[in-house]
Curated annotation (Swiss-Prot):
A GO biological process held by the record: late viral transcription
Residues flagged as site, Interaction with host RNAP: 70, 74, 77
Positions of the UniProt region annotated as Chaperons the template-strand ssDNA of the transcription bubble: 114-153
Organism per entry: Enterobacteria phage T4
Protein name listed in UniProt: RNA polymerase sigma-like factor
Coiled coil region boundaries: none
Stated role: Plays a role in the transcription of the viral late genes by acting as a late promoter recognition subunit. Associates with host RNA polymerase (RNAP) core and thus replaces the host sigma-70/rpoD subunit in the complex. May also play a role in DNA packaging by interacting with the terminase subunit gp17.
Name of the coding gene: 55
Documented effect of changing residue 74 to A: Loss of interaction with host RNAP core
Domain of life: Viruses
DNA-binding region: 114
Length: 185
């Protein structure tokens, strides 16, 4: 008979939930406002493993290692800051909560990094590169400059909202049963 291998989960959700419950109980019992109740190592290790695992997801595979390290750091920070909001009486899946906090932090980091890259490109195009200087034109490849222009305009277009982009109220054009309520003459 074939024996199934146990599935390896890098974070045990039940142990993590129990650690969070213990930490929040200790936090609630803390009477001294100057005393900081630290999260234990189980929670910290789980947050680090979840952030590291999420960085390997296909959504984030194309980013450089430096961006990924920044994303992981932001994810860990967001998870630690927001873990006190986790309602252990209502939800039993802290892994999903931490993953969502990390995911949102990753997306915010990507937006921030893209904005910084757009600033660098804009500075280069407007202050460094001079198309009227023959020496500069000879040094710089035209496809490189065109690529920078394309990336810069793509970012600028993504930040502007078109006037018709606001959410409109949905008008229900589906057939109604109002004709049943009309009074017969």
């Amino acid at each position: 008979m074939s024996e199934t291998k146990p599935k390896y989960n890098y974070v045990n959700n039940k142990e993590l939930l129990q650690a969070i419950i213990d930490w929040k109980t200790e936090l609630a019992n803390n009477k001294d406002p100057n005393k900081v109740v630290r999260q234990n190592d189980t929670i910290g290790l789980a947050i680090m493993l979840i952030a590291e695992g999420l960085s390997k997801r296909f959504n984030f595979s194309g980013y450089t290692q430096s961006w990924k390290q920044e994303m992981i750091a932001d994810g860990i920070e967001a998870s630690i800051k927001g873990l006190h909001n986790f309602d252990e009486t209502k939800y039993k899946n802290p892994h999903a909560y931490i993953t969502q906090a990390c995911f949102n932090a990753f997306v915010q980091r990507i937006k921030k990094e893209r904005k910084e890259v757009a600033k660098k490109y804009s500075y280069f195009v407007h202050n460094v590169y001079d198309s009227r200087d023959d020496d500069m034109v000879a040094l710089v490849d035209e496809t490189f400059i065109q690529d920078i222009y394309d990336k810069m305009t793509h970012y600028e277009e993504s930040t502007y909202r078109t006037p018709g982009a606001e959410k409109k109220s949905v008008v229900d054009d589906s057939p109604s049963l109002d004709f049943l309520y009309e009074a017969n003459d």
